[in-house]
Regions:
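Conserved active-site and SAM-binding loop architecture
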Residues: 1-249
């Protein structure tokens, strides 16, 4: 893999004639999850404005095939603008069709696609490790809510409701996100005890090999939050693999 630096400073003409372009630009200011924060959620005028650089790249390279990925925008106007710029209608795909994680994303592509498969039967317990270090378990009090529901318990901490949720291993995981502290990591009830999902579990939920993110940067191993955030910001591998399989048609 060759890195070509900052997207804002790149000379796209050098890549003219490449056959395939894959793009997934910053989604923070498009996300419905963060719509309550006007400081963050300002659509394509915010951090997600890097989308327009990706469009510049698409027009300069003129690849035979392309795929753009992004969250469901909080604004219909943003969705319309993105679709007009890319030039094809998006398809909404939930990665639960391919993995143990529900993750709805829009994909804009001119790759010929077949019929979407039925939802995968995989759930959280199917990819959980046999044994987990004690450091991943919470010492905080928790309350069992309803073992027949996906959110089966609640951690007793001073944080927003979403961050207190403990998930039932008999269901699929909800959408992974980046981690910024404050109990943002996803939680599961494991043998009657609440714990945070491990880095390996985050990787498996995205369809990646174990310890895919166990790497060093500037001589230091990536932290738990950095590794999980990479997964939260990344693509679901089996979903993208299915889309790219259309190139064989």
């Amino acid at each position: 893999m060759v890195h070509h630096g900052d997207l804002y400073e790149a000379d796209f003409e050098q890549f003219k004639g490449f056959d395939l372009l894959l793009a997934g630009t910053c989604c923070q200011s498009l996300s419905r999850v963060r719509i309550e924060s006007k400081k963050v959620n300002n659509g394509l005028d915010g951090k997600s404005g890097i989308f327009f650089k990706a469009i510049e790249c698409l027009r300069a390279i003129q690849p035979q095939y392309f795929m753009f990925e992004n969250v469901i925008p909080s604004s219909d106007e943003d969705l319309k603008t993105m679709t007009e710029c890319i030039g094809v209608e998006p398809i909404l795909i939930d990665s639960g069709r391919f993995s143990s994680q529900n993750r709805e994303r829009y994909y804009w592509t001119n790759i010929p696609l077949g019929k979407l498969p039925d939802e995968s039967p995989l759930v959280l317990k199917d990819i959980m490790e046999n044994s987990v270090d004690e450091k991943y378990f919470y010492k905080k009090d928790f309350e069992i809510l309803d073992m027949s529901k996906r959110v089966c318990a609640e951690l007793k901490v001073n944080s927003m409701e979403m961050n207190r949720r403990i998930y039932n291993p008999d269901f699929k995981c909800c959408t992974l996100t980046c981690i910024n502290g404050g109990y943002h990591e996803k939680k599961v009830l494991d043998s009657g005890r609440p714990r945070k999902l491990t880095e390996v579990k985050y990787e498996r939920l995205q369809g990646l090999p174990d310890n895919f993110t166990k790497i060093q940067l500037n001589g230091r191993w990536l932290s738990y939050s950095k590794r999980c955030s990479l997964m939260g910001n990344g693509w679901n591998e089996p979903t993208v693999e299915w889309i790219l399989s259309g190139l064989n048609n």
